[in-house]
Curated annotation (Swiss-Prot):
Protein name: Capsid protein
Family: Belongs to the orthohepadnavirus core antigen family.
Pfam families the record matches: Hepatitis_core (PF00906)
UniProt cross-references to SUPFAM superfamilies, sorted A to Z: Hepatitis B viral capsid (hbcag)
Gene this chain is encoded by: C
Length: 183
């Protein structure tokens, strides 16, 4: 069974496969980043977002893989076989977990649309012959000027008033305090 864990987020395994394996930080660094930025949400019994849920699942999965590797290390007597299993887990499963952690941490940090745009631009950059592409690959932290990353529940601030709105020269009148606040 071939399940694409990125499908519900608008991405795919193929889209992430354009990034070389050495692009992704170590699992330890990714776990440290996830907990530094999102500890409260990850440990909360409340549902925060699909990205938080996916992060939790990836962290639990990695923990179970480490339990398996420890068990194999303790119970498999043939050193060559033991090394093969541990190497397979670290290389193949480790890469998949690193990709998952990176994707969801990046989506929470920069926004899903920005991350998807980045993955597409890196894919185009990699497939463009070297003679025709810029020397440096796109960088995720360099957000395009048109991209706006908003926090949940807050509306964007206006920089200039709407041209149709008339500005009064008189001081602003306050609404009556008798009304109860409305949320």
């Amino acid at each position: 069974m071939d399940i694409d864990t990125y499908k519900e987020f608008g991405a795919s395994v193929e889209l992430l496969s354009f990034l070389p394996s050495d692009f992704f930080p170590s699992i330890r660094d990714l776990l440290d980043t996830a907990f530094a930025l999102h500890r409260e949400a990850l440990e909360s019994p409340e549902h925060c977002s699909p990205h938080h849920t996916a992060l939790r699942q990836a962290i639990v999965c990695w923990g179970e893989l480490m339990n398996l590797a420890t068990w194999v290390g303790s119970n498999l007597e043939d050193p060559a076989s033991r090394e093969l299993v541990v190497s397979y887990v670290n290389v193949n499963m480790g890469l998949k977990i690193r990709q998952l952690l990176w994707f969801h941490i990046s989506c929470l940090t920069f926004g899903r649309e920005t991350v998807l745009e980045y993955l597409v631009s890196v894919g185009v950059w990699i497939r463009t012959p070297q003679a025709y592409r810029p020397p440096n690959a796109p960088i995720l932290s360099t957000l395009p000027e048109t991209t706006v990353v908003r926090r949940r529940g807050r509306s964007p601030r206006r920089r200039t008033p709407s041209p149709r709105r008339r500005r009064s020269k008189s001081p602003r009148r306050r609404r009556s305090q008798s009304r109860e606040s409305q949320c």
